[in-house]
Amino acid sequence: MTTEFVRQDLAQNSSTAAEPDRVRVIREGVASYLPDIDTEETAEWLESFDELLERSGPARARYLMLRLLERAGEQRVAIPALTSTDYVNTIPTELEPWFPGDEDVERRYRAWIRWNAAIMVHRAQRPGVGVGGHISTYASSATLYEVGFNHFFRGKSHPGGGDHVFIQGHASPGIYARAFLEGRLTTDQLDGFRQEHSHSGGGLPSYPHPRLMPDFWEFPTVSMGLGPMNAIYQARFNHYLHDRGIKDTSDQHVWAFLGDGEMDEPESRGLIQVAANEALDNLTFVINCNLQRLDGPVRGNGKIIQELESFFRGAGWNVIKVVWGREWDVLLHADRDGALVNLMNSTPDGDYQTYKANDGAYVRDHFFGRDPRTKALVADMSDQEIWNLKRGGHDYRKVYAAYRAAMEHKGQPTVILAKTIKGYTLGQHFEGRNATHQMKKLALEDLKNFRDVTRVPVSDAQLEEDPYLPPYYHPGPEAPEIRYLLERRRALGGFVPSRRTKSKPLALPGSDTYKALKKGSGSQAVATTMATVRTFKELLRDKNIGPRIVPIIPDEARTFGMDSWFPSLKIYNRNGQLYTSVDSELMLAYKESEVGQILHEGINEAGSTSSFTAVGTSYSTHDEPMIPIYIFYSMFGFQRTGDGLWAAADQMARGFVLGATAGRTTLTGEGLQHADGHSLLLASTNPAAVTYDPAFAYEIAHIIESGLQRMYGEDPENVFFYLTIYNEPYQQPAEPENLDVEALLKGLYLYRPAPEKRAKSAQILASGVAMPEALRAADLLASDWDVAADVWSVTSWGELNREGVAIEKHRLRHPDEPAGTPHVTSALADAAGPVIAVSDWMRAVPEQIRPWVPGTYVTLGTDGFGFSDTRPAARRYFNTDAESVVVAVLQGLARDGEIDASVAAQAAEQYRIDDVSAAGVSYADTGSA
């Protein structure tokens, strides 16, 4: 949008006596700051323009200015581009390409698809089921999809590798209906819509969910906003694979079908500049502008197409508007003075919606009748002819022209803004109505009218027999329309959507790769973040999987000690490095390259999560298994982008997610918004996330080795690993002899038994950075209180919980069968004394295993907000330091009747555990963020 600045100083010093009060307006982009090398010529041009304006009026002046801008662009004159154009089609009629298909045939089976989609949702509302669905979205977008399916979307058997199509979630009924005509789905399956487990014939998920329909859906697009973001990063990753020589993706296109209401989601628009910056001409957004969201108009007082045009064009996208169908061409051609275009420009979306909820007479009076010139344009047209003036998104030729132009455009991503009617063809109770999104069934008269519009050969008797169960329609596999439909898909490389479920396994490195991590750090203090980075550094050297590892970093590489990777792996940039880096002379210079391996996303966790998803699903989308390692401040992972990680799980992404600088007390000084004491809990809610909270480097080595085997071995699992790692350095021990690796991976093993027997016994369970405090607590218990404490390392509270829950579920369903014993129960079965759990997480994390811990169980944690202070002070405040653990153990012994409660009270007073100022500096407190 143009910004105007009034320069009063210039007005006051005007040199024109006849216009002393004239105010000079300076617009952005106008060359007021450039030297005028020929003032006389400039004055002549301006005078000519003034004369034109006076003689021919603003419309003619505007036309000539636009033509000049057009010619300047053709001649490659660098001038600011317009961000908004008239409310008409971008592609003029005379430049529309020939439509290559048989439009009559395609329209016939498009009508059948419309019918079956609506009937599927309608039948899902039958008595006793009532699971609903959305009818109107696909009704508005059927043409947008069908032009793509018939002429553009390439399947996986295509020589170029196939396209990636993100389908709008609410349009899923239409995709199922097409698959039914293709012979991929049965009527029984259609009747199982939204009844995935209860329907005997097999059910269909509500929306595109690959995890629920793994050989069909490829990309999840709900919740809304995730589709556009993930499509951008899928397109960028396709270039990444090509530029690094891993796969030729030059003939693969990414299509994202979106809704205009969806574009209000921050994720929908917030990353479109990435696509422009990366010149992703392999990406096309198709936005179905039916002008309505769930409750009402998207922009009742405005114009969403114009808004989106300005937004995308300003961000550097190629914009194609498909506003009006072919029936408008004659009227626009006859609009010699621009009255019709002016009417189109000035009518708000709320009125356009209302027009289509009425009839032709209403449109004549309330649209064309607002200007005598436009009223005269349609004077010879009947009300029905006016009513039949289609919107562009329902016109095969207009949509085809836009898609072809998008495919041919180079150097920019393209967005197609297609105007449609929500509930199109469904009748007066649906079309353009505010409630249409929530309407899930049709009345008998609506069914009959819909049948007539779609010309489906279904009789009144069939509809009246049971209005809840009107029949689906399929003409049979030998019908010419079905043969045509299938031939088009064969020519384009197979069915879409379709998902590859198997991929080649990787040759994984042996255990020797992890040797260094298992030796310990000696006297050197090393944080688990550094140990993790070192592990992957070793893996990057492996000739088989090294090139397939993709580090994903949201602008924190230096914090995590990964800046040494910049010069060796390099940062991926399609344009290479066109500047001289300020540190180019240094060994650890910031190096960008078109063949770089690192995806450095800037301060952008949302985009990083989308990159993780694209990389982590490459085994399916490209048959090229890639290994993402996405590392971030743990507070800004599941808390900030949990929805994206949930979608990654739905898409069955594999890889490593690393929550660095984890814990509530470890990140000294950073404070409330950075101190993470709950991401493990959030991660535990994601069924695909395998969570670990390792304390030692050798644990990390085993966990990563296990993760690679589970995700990339001979029988890969559709999971991803979430490791919480810390920035607090402490001495890393060597791997103990006879380490029970199986127990470590299950989530619990005995790390250090009490060195000698004492009067009383206890068990301390610790994870992550709490381990040094637990070990110190065991020493204090032995020296000060004559208590022998075994120290256990809990590598995964979450995995212990899941095992326990699974066993309980089996026990519930099969009470007469042995259900097994949870690992935590069997491990602690013979352990003496109370069990005290401590971590740098809120207590709800260790509380996950309470049902299966035998005996007295006490949990300590960091509940509440974090704050800025030293580590000892924070741990004393939350009572997770060694002294607090000692008191908790003594309280547990008192609860069991082993000692008097006064002993615990004595310890609490002695250690002053309620006094933050009394917190000592432990040997673990050697470093800062």
Curated annotation (Swiss-Prot):
Component of the pyruvate dehydrogenase (PDH) complex, that catalyzes the overall conversion of pyruvate to acetyl-CoA and CO(2). AceE has reductase activity with pyruvate but does not react with 2-oxoglutarate. It catalyses: N(6)-[(R)-lipoyl]-L-lysyl-[protein] + pyruvate + H(+) = N(6)-[(R)-S(8)-acetyldihydrolipoyl]-L-lysyl-[protein] + CO2. This is Pyruvate dehydrogenase E1 component. Gene3D superfamilies: 3.40.50.920, 3.40.50.970. It comes from the Bacteria. One of its GO terms (molecular function) is magnesium ion binding. NCBIfam families: aceE. InterPro entries: PDC_E1_N, PDH/Transketolase, PDH_E1, PDH_E1_M, THDP-binding, Transketo_C/PFOR_II, Transketolase-like_C_2, Transketolase_N. Keywords: Isopeptide bond, Magnesium, Oxidoreductase, Pyruvate, Thiamine pyrophosphate, Ubl conjugation. Homodimer. Part of the PDH complex, consisting of multiple copies of AceE (E1), DlaT (E2) and Lpd (E3). Its cofactor is Mg(2+); thiamine diphosphate. There is a cross-link at residue 375 (Isoglutamyl lysine isopeptide (Lys-Gln) (interchain with Q-Cter in protein Pup)). Its EC number is 1.2.4.1. It holds the Pfam family Transketolase_N.
